[in-house]
Amino acid sequence: MKTLMPKLFVFAIAGALATETLAEEWNVSVWGKRRAFTEHVHKLGELLDQKTNGEFTLNISYGGLSKNKENLDGISIGAFEMAQFCAGYHADKNRVVTVLELPFLGVENLAQEVAVSAAVYAHPAATEEMAQWNAKLLMTSPMPQYNLVGTGEPRTTLSDFEGMRVRATGGLGKAFAAAGSVPTSVTATEAYQAMESGVVDTVAFAQHAHLSFGTINQADWWTANLNPGTVNCPVVVNIDAYESLSDAHREALDGSVQEALDHYVANYGELLAKWDSVLAEKGVTKVEISADVIDAFRAKAADPIRDAWIADMEAQGLPGQELYDLVTSTLAEAKAAN
């Protein structure tokens, strides 16, 4: 008995240590505050906690780990294991996914946005480019078409866009520039102050961001149907951290992505359903842009910017035409499925 007890004690300690080494906590860098845009990350954390009995958890930090424009850099050096970023913040670092920010692609809903994003994320060119930053594309943060809020008289004609100072990034910024506007790429967290101080006249956001970042509180009007495009914001993971996961934890992570996205889309749908009441509550006029104006905007922005993007990508050795064709074919399939 005297010789057995120490052995049992050693085995117990070894077992405890083995169990402890299985525990995994990932730091996740996002920004702003919890909102529709980050609900899939929170849902992913809940699912991982449930599936692993608390052995794999996410520590989600809003701005405490990095600035939003530096999240991809943080991933590259292993400062944290997971992060969200928007392609327009550093288009030169994530050229492939900027195909999803081209104006007037024709995406009509969040399900279609998920489909085209997944197709591009799975393309070898996207995988290879993100690997340069030690990043693996995990899932998108699908957003509806962007629309403007502004002060003063509504901008309802193409001539009204000339000289308009607008917060718009990526392909959207280029679209407004083609119409004579002056785009600025201040971050989402800076947009309210830029609008309040008069640095910009208008801000292009999806609905959740107008609400979360307060630009709707500055607005006199909102365009209901301009729909020039959207911004693509991936969630990525550090490759080293991903590959170091146990098989069980990696399976739990990969197997939770679709459910997290489904939750995100359903939650965002609830926001869209009550958007008209939000406008009424805040006294914001809903502006419908005429079809002629939208067609004129599309003629100035869509084809020229698309052609320039494809040529630029091909010149850099990236399959620009192939990526654009992938988006259009995937979108056609998604629309046919509905």
In which residue ranges do the predicted regions lie?
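Hydrophobic alpha-helical targeting segments used for export or membrane insertion
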Residues: 9-13, 17
